Amino acid sequence: MSSQIKQVFARQILDSRGNPTIEVEVVLESGAFGRAAVPSGASTGIREALELRDGNKALFLGKSVYKAVENVNTKIAQAVKGLDALDQRLIDKTMIELDGSENKKNLGANAILGVSLATARAAASHLRKPFYRYLMDVKEYLMPVPMMNVINGGSHADNNVDMQEFMIVPAGFDTFSEALRCGTEVFHILKKVLIADGYSVAGVGDEGGYAPDLPSNEAAIEAILKAVKEAGYEPGKHVFIALDPASSEFYKDGKYELKSENKSLTSEEMIDYYAAWVEKYPIVSIEDGLAEEDWAGWKLLTEKLGNKVQLVGDDLFVTNPSILAKGIEKGIANSILIKLNQIGTLTETFEAMAMAGQAGYTCVVSHRSGETSDTIIADLAVATCSGQIKTGSLSRSDRIAKYNQLLRIEEELGENAIYPGIKAFVFNSDEEVEEVVQEIIVEDSEAEKVVVQVEE
C-alpha cells in the first residue's frame, strides 16, 4: 500500500500548564496513522521559531492556537497531501517554503512541527517499526543519561530562587533503569530533607520539581546533595549535579541580577561564581550560564570552564544550525540543547545535531516546560544516540511518560542498549561511546539519511 499522505488534521488541546497547544494527525493511503502534540516553553530564546498564538484575550487569555490549527487544516494539508511520508526532507522543505519566513511566523512553527512529527510517526507505522528505529536503524543505541530537574526556580516556579533548574544526574550506573530508580529515590528523600529544614514543598514547578523559597541559589545544591547521601548514594560517584540558570531571565542592563542574594554581577563575576561552584560541587553541566546576547561573556566562560564541565547552549543556539555554526566558529560552549519546537521541523533538528556532532559538541535532547503526554523526545534521544535527555522531575505524568517510554525502549533493546553514564559528557567520553555515536554522525551531504530510514 502507498505511503503517500492522504489526510492531515489538527486540533487544539491543552498542555501541562493548561494552555492551548496543537495536536496533529496524519493518515497515509496505506491506513498508517501518526499523531503528535507540540510543547511550549516559558523562558524562550529571542531567536526561536515563532509559536503562533491568536492573541485574543477573550479566548484562553490570548493563548489559543486556532489560527495555527486552521493553517494545518487548510494551507499545509493542501500542500503535503499526496507527498510520500517516507521523504521527511521533502515534507519539511515543502512547509518551510510554503511559510516563506525566516522564523516560520506565517504558518507558525507549532503548526509546521506538528505536521512534521505526525508525518514521521505515520511513516514509522507504515513500515511497522518502532519510532526510534525508524529515525535511525543501527545495531546498538545509547540510552540517554537523564538530567532530572528536582528543584525549580526562575520562570518555572513561584518562588524566590533565581536559577531555573537544579538537576540530579544519576550517571554512576550501568543501565537506564538503575539510574531512574536512583533518581526517583533521591527525589522522594529530597522532599523529606526540605521539610525537615523548614521549607514548604506544598507545590511543584512546571517541570515537576519542588519549588521552595530558599535563602540562596547555593542552598538548592546543598539540599540536593544532602538528599543524595540520605538516599544511600555518593555525590560525584553515583549522582552528579547539572544546572540551568536560564540566565537571560535575570540579565538586566549588562548585569546578572541575583535578587535572592542581593547581588548584581558582571559577566566576569558571574563566571567566577560558577567556577567556585564547579570546584566545590560535582557539577557536570551548566546550561545557559550566561545570557543569549552575552557572546563575549560566553567566550570567557568557555575558555575558563569548557574543559571542566559541559556548557550547554539553549537560548544561545535555539536548535538553529546557522546560529550553532557561528558558535562553533567562535569557540562558544561545547554542547547544544535540542528542542524540536525551537526550530520547527524534524529535518532541521537533525541537521543541528549532525553539525554539533561533527564539531565535537554534545547534544542534550530536551522537553519544554509546557509539555504534553507525547513521548517523541524519548525516541529522538535514543535514535540519535545523544546520550543525554532533559525531561523534568519524577512527578507530573507529562514528565513521567518520557521516562516510562525509555524504560520500554531499554527493555526492547536488551543487550543492545548502552548506558554511557558519565562518559556521555564532553569531557569524559571514551572509545566505546564514541564508536556508537559515530554510527549516527554523518556529513552534511548525507543528512537526509539521518532524518529517516527509507526502505524501498
Curated annotation (Swiss-Prot):
Annotated compartments: Cytoplasm; Secreted; Cell surface
Residue positions binding Mg(2+): D244, E287, D314
Main location per the UniProt record: cytoplasm
Superkingdom classification of source: Bacteria
Metabolic or biological pathway: Carbohydrate degradation; glycolysis; pyruvate from D-glyceraldehyde 3-phosphate: step 4/5
Cofactor note: Binds a second Mg(2+) ion via substrate during catalysis.
Keywords: Cytoplasm, Glycolysis, Lyase, Magnesium, Metal-binding, Secreted
Function text: Catalyzes the reversible conversion of 2-phosphoglycerate (2-PG) into phosphoenolpyruvate (PEP). It is essential for the degradation of carbohydrates via glycolysis.
NCBIfam families: eno
Complex formation: Component of the RNA degradosome, a multiprotein complex involved in RNA processing and mRNA degradation.
PANTHER family assigned: ENOLASE
Protein's name in the database: Enolase
Originating species: Francisella tularensis subsp. tularensis (strain SCHU S4 / Schu 4)
Lineage: Bacteria, Pseudomonadati, Pseudomonadota, Gammaproteobacteria, Thiotrichales
